[in-house]
Amino acid sequence: MEAHQFIKAPGITTAIEQAALAAANSALANAVVVRPFLSHQQIEILINLMQPRQLVFRPEVFWNHPIQRVIHNELELYCRARSGRCLEIGAHPRSINDNPNVVHRCFLRPAGRDVQRWYTAPTRGPAANCRRSALRGLPAADRTYCFDGFSGCNFPAETGIALYSLHDMSPSDVAEAMFRHGMTRLYAALHLPPEVLLPPGTYRTASYLLIHDGRRVVVTYEGDTSAGYNHDVSNLRSWIRTTKVTGDHPLVIERVRAIGCHFVLLLTAAPEPSPMPYVPYPRSTEVYVRSIFGPGGTPSLFPTSCSTKSTFHAVPAHIWDRLMLFGATLDDQAFCCSRLMTYLRGISYKVTVGTLVANEGWNASEDALTAVITAAYLTICHQRYLRTQAISKGMRRLEREHAQKFITRLYSWLFEKSGRDYIPGRQLEFYAQCRRWLSAGFHLDPRVLVFDESAPCHCRTAIRKAVSKFCCFMKWLGQECTCFLQPAEGVVGDQGHDNEAYEGSDVDPAESAISDISGSYVVPGTALQPLYQALDLPAEIVARAGRLTATVKVSQVDGRIDCETLLGNKTFRTSFVDGAVLETNGPERHNLSFDASQSTMAAGPFSLTYAASAAGLEVRYVAAGLDHRAVFAPGVSPRSAPGEVTAFCSALYRFNREAQRLSLTGNFWFHPEGLLGPFAPFSPGHVWESANPFCGESTLYTRTWSEVDAVPSPAQPDLGFTSEPSIPSRAATPTPAAPLPPPAPDPSPTLSAPARGEPAPGATARAPAITHQTARHRRLLFTYPDGSKVFAGSLFESTCTWLVNASNVDHRPGGGLCHAFYQRYPASFDAASFVMRDGAAAYTLTPRPIIHAVAPDYRLEHNPKRLEAAYRETCSRLGTAAYPLLGTGIYQVPIGPSFDAWERNHRPGDELYLPELAARWFEANRPTCPTLTITEDVARTANLAIELDSATDVGRACAGCRVTPGVVQYQFTAGVPGSGKSRSITQADVDVVVVPTRELRNAWRRRGFAAFTPHTAARVTQGRRVVIDEAPSLPPHLLLLHMQRAATVHLLGDPNQIPAIDFEHAGLVPAIRPDLAPTSWWHVTHRCPADVCELIRGAYPMIQTTSRVLRSLFWGEPAVGQKLVFTQAAKAANPGSVTVHEAQGATYTETTIIATADARGLIQSSRAHAIVALTRHTEKCVIIDAPGLLREVGISDAIVNNFFLAGGEIGHQRPSVIPRGNPDANVDTLAAFPPSCQISAFHQLAEELGHRPAPVAAVLPPCPELEQGLLYLPQELTTCDSVVTFELTDIVHCRMAAPSQRKAVLSTLVGRYGRRTKLYNASHSDVRDSLARFIPAIGPVQVTTCELYELVEAMVEKGQDGSAVLELDLCSRDVSRITFFQKDCNKFTTGETIAHGKVGQGISAWSKTFCALFGPWFRAIEKAILALLPQGVFYGDAFDDTVFSAAVAAAKASMVFENDFSEFDSTQNNFSLGLECAIMEECGMPQWLIRLYHLIRSAWILQAPKESLRGFWKKHSGEPGTLLWNTVWNMAVITHCYDFRDLQVAAFKGDDSIVLCSEYRQSPGAAVLIAGCGLKLKVDFRPIGLYAGVVVAPGLGALPDVVRFAGRLTEKNWGPGPERAEQLRLAVSDFLRKLTNVAQMCVDVVSRVYGVSPGLVHNLIGMLQAVADGKAHFTESVKPVLDLTNSILCRVE
């Protein structure tokens, strides 16, 4: 066997590529999302700093400090995920509301920039109290925060976090503060740039600018728009150098995360800190080079900028390394300063070759270049000197050693020491130097700095004083402060130092052993009763949990606890890890804080500790007011009754859903194993393992019981809680998605107790905090346009977020409704629990959101303003509210004023509940017209607009007018243009008419009406009957003014036409534009001609016209009538014209629309302008559209011109739509098929069809030889080696091809349309005579505007606007182009799926111009053929499925004749094309149109995206009339080649055909036609056949083909987005609808025709049921593509 080094192993290559793809997907899935807008330089900085993390840029916000904030957010996530419930130091005000896990926050009184931060802090939630205290100097309102600072606060907390808030504290100060808090761990994020270790100066790096004046350091990052960060230098230096604090408060400081010079420090209290050296900047990209002369002195008495020049300069490390390598390796004669300068200049330029950066470059200042050249030259000179001296002294030493005698060598061997510590070379020290010598070096490399200093805490007073005095003495001597307690600064160590803390480990490797609690424990619910009470669970759940006992198997491995809970017949799994996300029933998030070393867990207000004891597992629970211990014995408990477990799960789910609906912040979502487990109430990673393998996700209690109404059953006992949920009957409700288990009977004794939530006789029954849903008896009375509703019934049946109580001034329990609230929610009257007050109203969230509103007492005084305020004070909330009629009870407020006050002061979606007396009043006074509610905000904005408007000359008449909040009733008559809305108004019905323009005013006045423009009408509309014409186009503030001032108001207008325009661009018009609901719609126009109606039908689907003018739009003619333009500039350029806005509402006999280029944006953004322009004329409209603006919005004459050019006529035809009905479920056999497992169904299908999982995703078959035509190839045939799919199963039942591959497109072009065509020259008369058995002589066909309308309608449904239809110019490529596409669907097969050797299928798309030219003719011919078809012959899909099935069922004694064409399109030639042209001529199509069709079909060019084929004769699927002519050719071949006896039914669709007959034979002339055209027919004659996706069974009918449908589902890609899964569900649902009445019959027939077992079909139907229920499971697979293509041979014909 020969092996070669260049042979590639495909398997290994594929595995490597898949691994690389998986790595890339994993990196993207865990990428950091960068939200701010960044410059190119900022992006490069972030990418370099965040390596190796993957970044995803989604710019959507502007930040002042984008680079720092991205780093800050990343480090903040790390700190908060590990800290759990903690104390936070110096929190940013905007982060307070987002982090509920913080138990206390330490602030300082705001000064400077902090004041600005507090002003922009949120004014809601916990941040509001902090903001108020900070800005007003008030003391803290509660214990959650303080302003004493971290050093002055003593709030106890075990863990803390400090995000960039410790820069002004030393490590010693932090250690003492942590001791006062009792804190053991503190996560601190700090910004520690290395430049603070250098002397004062200005340092500029690639990322930031740092100014160091000796005391303070200011850092400003690249691209910042505000001031930089200002910190104390000494503190930053101490944080960099210190790794431990010694003394009475010892600490260990670890660097657990680092991004650039941003660090997360973990400060841990440790009794004996050990040495922990670390390298702070191992990835530093700068080297700091010293300037020998320094920055220079001060040139005068006054300081200048030169004093800020740097002693050191930041130089890119790659520049310094390359410069030193170049200089050190130069020849002695070549080494000089000028050569170094030349080289430095060369490497300082950035060089890019394509996308490869060959040289990064360096943009340096003159000072930096001078310092670098000087330092490099002197350093290299010193190194060369050392090299020379080392060689010289070494040679002399070698000569002396080799000259030694025997005695000298013996002496050295006997007396000189050697051992383990001996290192070669250590015995020689030719050169020694001092730190301050010039030869000690000119640069500082941060990459090799190592620090391990200790800082004594301030309690060591005597030692600190001695050290201070010694340091001062050393400074007096002119020396550096080298304290003997600390190592020297900047110790240089190896560059690969392994710092475990720096790499990210926050676990001490020497931690104490963790106790193992693994085992099986018995957890009875009775042992956790105190915890349930602390959790505020309803009595029902507590009682049910007390009767259950669970077995919990605990497994503890590597700081992780896995629990398996066995509860009855259910198994739950949970995994406890630090930082795990706990499921909640609200927006608030909770993360589990789990410390295995301390055996503690905490989240929210709950915490627990556990330990293994002799009696079992001992757990201590701590919560609000609870300190409870429980011991769980080892062993296995008896299994609880399944019915009890099911009832417990259902009650628990109802409680969770009720709490989720009522809670604003949310609490834990309680799972069964979370309440019956040793670590209650936590249940992270909840998983339910069902014992039934055919059960899907819907069998979980979280889905199943949501569909069950929790109504107490009177037949079952009630122990003070809601009884078992009753299952609705099948006849009353739809069939559930999965079968539900019947509820088990309650084994407890029967007691007589009142239902939950109802008062017992002689006692007050108090409902729990969260009530359960009961049966509703409310009645809907009215719905407002904003979604608000009025009900008759009980307020407590509402599902709104808030309930409003009619309270008293003191908010104490009272009578009436207030007493009912106290009965249900007594805790809501606790004043200490009020979260907010607004006026007299009080808001509380305990035990649910309730607003106590106070109405005035009308027994003492009538106070309408107080009544308005009572409702208005309840609107300061989020969510909806349910109201009573405030004050209408004891306070004797009349119903009418209270109801009107609610109408004016409520929010959208609110509900009002009326008692019976008020409900009868409402029904007697029900609004008969739509109402417009003017809220305070709308009124305020409208008044502002009126005030601005009254300052102009036009609006002076509106001065002093006001809009007040209230409710206005109106009548709105809307209609299509020209429907006669204005003509319907008579003078007796109106006093004043308000119109938007002077033209309309004059037209109304000519009719005798008192008409005014909106501004002048302000003087006359008060108390009058007002009609407002073109109401939507009036300025909304004037519209509201007139509607409110009028006695009655009648609006006229068209919502689809031009609305009011905000000419001032102040934003007031869209803010107050009212939402008007038409009371009546008029759809008949008396103005618009027929062609205009068709153009605007998209906006007016029901428009009809009485006009006799059929065509009124003309292009390219001289201007006539009134000129209409779109802009004021066009109006100035065309005298006598008016703008479209001014012409709105007017009618002209003839118009001319002039579209100018400056109106492009107006027309594209507002189609209403085009509608108004088109609907102003009655007879003729000339369009002058030089820029083509109207063509861009679909208004063109090309379609109409081509239609009349082809011989179309104006007239009427029957529509081509076939009426279809939906059969009723009279025999619902589908209901007997339960959902089944998807996996088992597809595996059974694979077993019975013999298909196996394919190792490849697709096959590129060998490309055949090009036999005719000319093929144009792309330069590159790049293909994808693999395909990613989301599939239902890994076994595909279709021919596997790769439609998206370039080689597949070539194979299809050559294999299907490049094959040689067999020409057949013969007369068509014989074939036409045979075809007459199915299609008799047609005769002349009339093509009318009905076919044109159907063509346009089809284009609109596909999202086309007609702009692609051009004038018929055969020289234009856009007119004659034929586009080729590869079909993205493969054929279902029961045979081989891979080795089929078939090329793909293609589809062509003719130009829209040709489709519009031939389309109406082909539609008319198709209608003529359908009218002539004999009885029992079915064409295409132009029939109702039930009719076809009935015809098949009637042919009981027939067999099924099937014919399958092979290469149906490829075998069509000049003969089939000639037959088509003969039928066209027979129908009366113009000769030039027939010859054009023959020309296009006989010689064509298929244009693929990157390939093209010039060929002849072949037919392509996708051209206009494809179904028509394919079906006609199919009919002609079958009827000419075969004779049938007792023909009962014949159906033809494309290349599919069946004939139901008793027997058949081949006709005498068949061989000639088959041989002449090269036809390939595959005939089958059997009892049951297949046709167009259905199974044809004579005597039974046409049944859906379940096997084929399920098999085709396996081939498609159903991802990656959810919209594909929804398309699958809808398609399967439509298919199952066909099986409603024939499911069982389908099982028997389909199994017989495919030769499979009936169980397979039964299983497939169940699988489809599961998919239709939304339970489809998808598997992502990455499979290679098998490429079998060879070279393509081209030959020019």
From Swiss-Prot:
Location of region: RNA-directed RNA polymerase: 1207-1693
Gene Ontology MF term list: ATP binding; cysteine-type peptidase activity; helicase activity; metal ion binding; mRNA methyltransferase activity; RNA binding; RNA-directed RNA polymerase activity
(+)RNA virus helicase ATP-binding domain boundaries: 934-1082
Modifications after synthesis and translation: ORF1 polyprotein does not seem to be processed into distinct enzymatic domains by a viral protease belonging to ORF1, but could be processed by a host serine protease like thrombin.
Domain Alphavirus-like MT: 56-240
Region described as NTPase/helicase: 960-1204
Residue ranges of domain (+)RNA virus helicase C-terminal in the record: 1083-1216
Location of the region described as Y-domain in the Swiss-Prot/TrEMBL record: 241-439
One cellular component (GO) term of this entry: host cell perinuclear region of cytoplasm
Top-level taxon: Viruses
EC nos: 2.1.1.-, 2.7.7.-, 3.4.22.-, 3.6.4.-
Paired cysteines (S-S): 434-481
Region (X-domain): 785-942
Quaternary organization: The protease domain interacts with host EIF2AK4 (via C-terminus); this interaction inhibits dimerization of EIF2AK4 and prevents EIF2AK4-mediated phosphorylation of host EIF2A.
Stated name of the protein: Non-structural polyprotein pORF1
Organism: Hepatitis E virus genotype 1 (isolate Human/Pakistan/Sar-55) (HEV-1)
